Amino acid sequence: AVGGIPTDEEQATGLEEIVMVAAQXGADXYDVM
């Protein structure tokens, strides 16, 4: 959804990416957000 509200699917994907990056960095996912 370019320039619009992201769909639930896009939001979930973004959240999964954040969690994966946080896990790789050894940080708490909530600290990244």
Curated annotation (Swiss-Prot):
It comes from the Eukaryota. It is a peripheral membrane protein. The keyword Mitochondrion applies. Pfam families: COX5B. Keywords: Membrane, Mitochondrion, Mitochondrion inner membrane. One of its GO terms (biological process) is mitochondrial electron transport, cytochrome c to oxygen. This is Cytochrome c oxidase subunit 5B liver, mitochondrial. Belongs to the cytochrome c oxidase subunit 5B family. Component of the cytochrome c oxidase, the last enzyme in the mitochondrial electron transport chain which drives oxidative phosphorylation. The respiratory chain contains 3 multisubunit complexes succinate dehydrogenase (complex II, CII), ubiquinol-cytochrome c oxidoreductase (cytochrome b-c1 complex, complex III, CIII) and cytochrome c oxidase (complex IV, CIV), that cooperate to transfer electrons derived from NADH and succinate to molecular oxygen, creating an electrochemical gradient over the inner membrane that drives transmembrane transport and the ATP synthase. One of its GO terms (cellular component) is respiratory chain complex IV. It comes from Oncorhynchus mykiss (Rainbow trout). It is found in: Mitochondrion inner membrane. Its main location: mitochondrion. Component of the cytochrome c oxidase (complex IV, CIV), a multisubunit enzyme composed of 14 subunits. The complex is composed of a catalytic core of 3 subunits MT-CO1, MT-CO2 and MT-CO3, encoded in the mitochondrial DNA, and 11 supernumerary subunits COX4I, COX5A, COX5B, COX6A, COX6B, COX6C, COX7A, COX7B, COX7C, COX8 and NDUFA4, which are encoded in the nuclear genome. Pathway: Energy metabolism; oxidative phosphorylation.
